[in-house]
Amino acid sequence: DYVPKSVVELPSYERVKEDKRDYAIASRRELEEADAVRGKTLIQRHGKYILVQNPPMQPLDTKQLDYVYSLPYERWYRECYESLGGVPGINEVLFSITHNRGCFGACNFCSLAFHQGRAVTVRSEKSIIEEAESFLDNPRFKGYISDVGGPTANFRLPSCEKQKKLGLCKNRRCLAPTPCPNMQVSHTEYLDILRKLRNLKGIKKVFIRSGIRFDYLIEDENDEFFR
């Protein structure tokens, strides 16, 4: 059957179901096209049907992320869970702050690149500080921010300037097997945000509990983040 050049066909559902190699091929093609700039439409045959997946939308920009995190979330589980003993895991994230989205690390064992994409977008400093200040009105808050992180805590920049126009590289990874020479590396803004949060009245300590990419960290010529 004719398949347009603007479309990438994955191995059929039946082939993926029966063959590990076809499963791997389908997964790789899906990851390669998961880019809002250059990603193509994906199709996969499923019996007499054809599944169509449209190209990814543009990731939320800073203004949009700020809006999402400005909404009046309850920061607690619904009352119906009380009879089941509550939700113990809520305490791990109750007073944590997400400052970014996306990860260009693309580790083989990790699914972050699939469900958040490789393009990194961030919230503004103002939005992050306002969320921290909102904790002070919560009677459960004891002064400890458990995490200021995200998929990868120490990513505050796009991987490179080229990705804005050309998208992320299809057949290369930014950090492996060796860091790309075009990669932007800086922890200055992230460190500044952490310090401003720590200095807020009512904040005792600020922690990082999300993963830190050390291979990215050691590429930074400024070693202040280590101190």
Locate predicted features.
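Extended, regular secondary-structure scaffolds
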Residues: D1-P11, G85, R118-K126, A132-N138
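Flexible, acidic/Gly-rich N-terminal and inter-domain linker regions that tether
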Residues: D1-V93
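Short acidic (Asp/Glu) and glycine-rich catalytic loops that position anionic groups and cofactors
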Residues: T41-I50, Y69, Y77, A106-Q116, ...
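Cysteine-cluster motifs in flexible loop/terminal segments that predominantly coordinate metals
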Residues: P55, P59, C80, G89, ...
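Generic beta-strand/beta-sheet core signal
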Residues: L71, I97-G102, N108-A113, R123, ...
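N-terminal pre-triad scaffold of radical SAM enzymes
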Residues: E82-S111, I129, K142-Y144
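Cysteine-centered iron-sulfur cluster-binding motifs in ferredoxin-type domains/subunits
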Residues: S96-N108, A119, S127, E131, ...
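Conserved SAM/AdoMet-binding glycine-rich loop
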Residues: S134-R227
